[in-house]
C-alpha cells in the first residue's frame, strides 16, 4: 500500500489550575509516501516520511476529553481545572478556526466542601438528538446539554446513592442509537442508560483482582453491535453485546515488561483487521500500544510510546493510529499498515497530552493540560 496525504494536528493545550495559562496547539504534519513500489517490491510496502510542527492557540482550563460533531463540524471539550472545582465548563469550538464559540454555564452545587461547579470530565456528542453528554465524575452524576443553546436538558445530579440509577464515579460516556443506550464507565460497573426512559442498567464485568476496586478506563468503543471496554485494574478487554449486555469474550492485554499494563483506550481498523489498545503501564513500563487480531484477539505486537500512553484514535482511510502520551505531553503517530511501527512523535505545549480525536478530513484534535504552572492575572472587582 502506498500513502500520499497531508495531515494536520490540532491540539488544545491548557493549564491544569484555575489561573494557569491556556493554549491550543495546531500541529501541521505531512505524511508523504514514496512512489509506487517497483515490481520486485511487495505491493503492501510503503515508506512514510513525516514532518511536524506545533502552533499554539488559546484553550480551556483543565481540559479532560474532546469530542467531535460530524453534523455541525464543531469540537466539544469538557474541562475541570482543579480538584476543588473552582473552574469547570464545556465549550463548543469551530473545527476549522479552533476559536471558542460558546461555553456553558455549569450548575453550582453544594457539597461537603461548600459551593462548587458541577465538574465536567468526560464528553460525547449525540448528533441524532442534538445534544452532548457529560460525565460529572467527582459529583457522581451525568448531564445532557443542548448543542445549540448549551442549556442543561437532563441530569442525574441530586439523586440518592440508594437510587438504582445512581452511578458511582462516571468517567466516559458514549451514545449508541442502534441499541438505544448511552454507555457509561465507572467504578465497579459499566452502566447502560436508556435514551428514552433514562433508566440505568448495570453491566457486571469479571471481578477485579484480589477483590480490589475495579477502575474502568477512560474510553470505550462501540463497533458492530459490540461494546469494547478496557478494564484498567485487571488488564483485560471485555467485549459486550450491546443488546443483551452479556460479556461475549475477554482477552488479556500485553506489554513489553512484567507488571501491570493498565489498558486505557481502544480502536479497531477493519481494513487491517486489527485492534489497537493504548496502555498507561506503571512508571514508564508497558506504556504504549498493543495490537491484536480483531477476529481471534490473538496478541500480535507491542509498540512502546512515551511513559504514560493514554487516549487513542485511528484514521482507517490511511491506516494511521494516534496516541496521546500524558507522561511526555507528545502525540505518537503509528503506521498501522503492515509495518505497525511508531513513525513520529509530535510535541504539544509542554503539558500533559490528555485526549484526542481524528476528524473526517484526517486532522487530529488533541487536548492537554499544563503541568501545574500558575500565572498572575490582573483583574478589577466591579
What are these regions (language model features)?
Residues 26-382:
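Predominantly soluble domains enriched in secretory-pathway, periplasmic, or organellar proteins
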Amino acid at each position: 500500500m502506498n500513502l500520499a496525504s497531508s495531515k494536520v494536528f490540532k491540539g488544545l493545550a491548557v493549564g491544569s489550575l484555575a489561573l494557569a495559562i491556556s493554549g491550543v496547539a495546531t500541529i501541521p504534519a505531512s505524511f508523504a509516501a514514496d512512489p509506487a513500489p517497483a515490481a520486485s517490491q511487495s505491493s503492501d510496502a510503503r515508506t512514510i516520511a513525516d514532518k511536524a510542527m506545533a502552533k499554539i492557540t488559546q484553550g480551556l482550563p483543565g481540559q479532560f476529553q474532546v469530542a467531535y460533531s460530524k453534523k455541525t463540524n464543531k469540537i466539544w471539550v469538557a474541562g475541570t481545572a482543579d480538584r476543588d472545582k473552582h473552574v469547570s465548563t464545556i465549550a463548543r469550538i469551530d473545527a476549522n478556526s479552533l476559536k471558542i464559540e460558546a461555553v456553558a454555564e455549569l450548575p453550582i452545587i453544594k457539597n461537603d466542601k461548600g459551593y462548587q461547579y458541577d465538574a465536567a470530565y468526560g464528553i460525547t456528542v449525540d448528533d441524532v438528538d442534538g445534544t452532548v453528554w457529560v460525565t460529572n465524575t467527582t459529583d457522581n452524576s451525568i448531564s445532557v446539554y443542548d448543542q445549540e443553546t448549551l442549556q442543561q436538558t437532563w441530569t442525574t445530579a441530586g439523586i440518592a446513592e440508594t437510587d438504582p440509577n445512581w452511578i458511582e464515579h462516571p468517567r466516559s460516556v458514549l451514545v449508541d442509537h442502534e441499541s438505544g443506550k448511552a454507555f457509561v464507565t465507572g467504578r465497579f460497573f459499566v452502566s447502560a442508560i436508556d435514551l428514552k426512559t433514562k433508566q440505568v442498567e448495570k453491566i457486571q464485568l469479571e471481578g477485579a483482582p484480589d477483590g480490589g476496586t475495579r477502575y474502568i478506563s477512560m474510553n470505550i468503543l462501540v463497533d458492530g453491535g459490540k461494546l469494547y471496554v478496557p478494564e484498567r485494574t485487571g488488564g483485560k478487554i471485555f467485549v459486550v453485546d450491546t443488546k443483551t449486555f452479556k460479556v461475549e469474550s475477554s482477552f488479556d492485554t500485553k506489554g513489553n515488561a512484567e507488571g501491570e499494563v493498565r489498558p486505557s483506550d481502544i480502536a479497531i481498523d477493519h481494513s487491517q483487521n486489527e485492534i489497537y489498545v493504548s496502555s498507561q503501564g506503571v512508571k514508564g513500563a508497558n506504556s504504549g500500544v498493543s495490537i491484536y487480531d480483531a477476529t481471534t484477539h490473538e496478541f500480535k505486537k507491542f509498540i512502546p510510546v512515551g511513559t504514560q500512553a493514554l487516549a487513542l484514535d485511528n484514521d482507517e482511510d490511511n491506516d494511521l493510529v494516534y496516541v496521546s502520551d500524558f507522561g511526555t505531553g507528545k502525540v505518537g503517530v503509528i503506521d498501522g499498515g503492515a509495518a505497525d511501527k511508531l513513525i513520529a512523535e509530535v510535541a504539544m505545549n509542554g503539558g500533559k497530552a490528555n485526549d484526542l480525536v481524528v476528524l473526517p478530513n484526517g486532522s487530529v484534535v488533541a487536548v492537554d493540560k499544563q503541568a501545574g504552572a500558575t500565572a498572575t492575572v490582573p483583574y478589577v472587582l466591579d
